[in-house]
Amino acid sequence: MEIINQTIALMDETAAVKALSALAQAQRLRAFRALVAAGSDGLTPGVISEQLGVTPSALSFHLKELSHSGLVNAEARGRNLIYRASFDHMTALLGYLTAHCCQGQACEASSLAQCLDC
């Protein structure tokens, strides 16, 4: 429980708004979901562009927005960039939303493991 509380503490209102704003656009949400599905292997921009049917220049803009929000990390691997979802940031955002969703009263949050279609 302490680890969860520490993760939630990493998220404040400003960071939550930034992350939610980044996800409040269809192409960025699709790109983020593709990166979540890819897991720790991540994806190159070319693969994401092909999967989503988005031009490379448009995707570059969207990945930059996701990176600035903290939801996505990029790593140079040779001549390629590998993008990965930041699961720590995503968990902190979900924890922040859950912790503040019931106006200070206990609320029942279902397990994330139950969200198989996400």
Predicted features by range, described:
Residues M1-A15, V36, F87-C118:
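Amphipathic alpha-helical dimerization/coiled-coil segments
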Residues L10, T14-T55, R77-H89:
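N-terminal helix-turn-helix DNA-binding core of bacterial DNA-binding proteins
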Residues E50, S67-H68:
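Alpha-helical residues within the helix-turn-helix
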Residues L63-K64:
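Short, hydrophobic-biased segments on the C-terminal half of alpha helices
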Residues E75-A76, C107:
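Conserved catalytic-core motifs of GNAT/GCN5-like acyltransferases
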